[in-house]
Amino acid sequence: MPDSDAQRRLSRGSPLDTLGENPDQEQGWEILKTFRSMGWDGGYRWRIQLKIMPRRQKTVTLNGLMYGDRWDGSPITRVDIVENPADVDAQGELIESETLRLLFRSGRGAFAMTKRSDVSGPPKVVDGSAVLEPIAGSEFALFDLMAPYVYWPRFRYEGRTTFRGSPTHLFWMYPPEEDLELKKRIGGVRLYINDQFNVLIQTQVFDTEETLLKTIYISGIERVDGQAIFKEMDIRNDVTRDKTRLKIVDASMGLSLPKNLFEAQSLMENLQTQNIAIGREERFEVVE
């Protein structure tokens, strides 16, 4: 298990910091359980941009749309990423957009499916090591978006430290023993969970030689419809130093979303063209 950057910059300013010592694993388990149970109230709709920033090539920006909710306590997400926008040819004929459609669920009952708008046939199930492959030419993989490592059963609580000026809990997550394909490529994942907001502010993915492969981190937290969300999420390839930024351009929170939005049939049509019945979650206040 490699030392964390935070451990090398360990702050002794707070008597509550335990990183580098022998933190209570039972306490760590309670912290992790609480984090896993957290989620936004209701569903959400985000208009997003993927800014692909390779070190030695031109930056490319892709637009997309993301819907999310929770099924039986597990996050489920439907995403469209427009890889090539609609256009017209020299004769004035419409050239349809090329869109990558994604549907995935994390935690209990996890699965992932994809469908390209320009390819005929049913959606494809993504499993095994295929979840580690980049999507839409970016540094993001389904593995990063699904974050299955949050739910891996075997972990070590590394302790609490001050990271980016805030109290933060660090966990080392071990890949499941039964997932042999994954274990060939991933040696472990380190989580940085902010104690104040109870959100994952940074993730580090390591290979089997404990070499840092990628770092995922969020920038900025804002409130939308009364709920805290991140503004941007960056993923950096620590081998090539290429980077991709996921930016939330516009957000609506606390939505009531139809179940069929998160079914495989939804992948047969772009989100922009679907008639999605969106409502607002009802909130009741106790009157004394």
Segment roles from a protein language model:
Residues 148-149, 153-154:
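Surface-exposed beta-loop interaction hotspot
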Residues 259-288:
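Gram-negative outer-membrane assembly/targeting C-terminal domains
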Residues 133-146, 157-265:
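Gly/Pro-enriched, hydrophobic low-complexity segments
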Residues 46, 77-79, 110, 155, ...:
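Well-ordered beta-strand positions enriched in small/hydrophobic/aromatic, beta-favoring residues
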Residues 110, 114-143:
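Acidic/charged, solvent-exposed loop-and-adjacent secondary-structure segments enriched in E/D, K/R, S/T
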Residues 12-119:
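N-terminal mature ectodomain segment of secretory-pathway/periplasmic proteins
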Residues 54-59, 85-95, 117-126, 178-184, ...:
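Short, surface-exposed beta-strand/loop "edge" segments at domain boundaries and coil↔beta transitions
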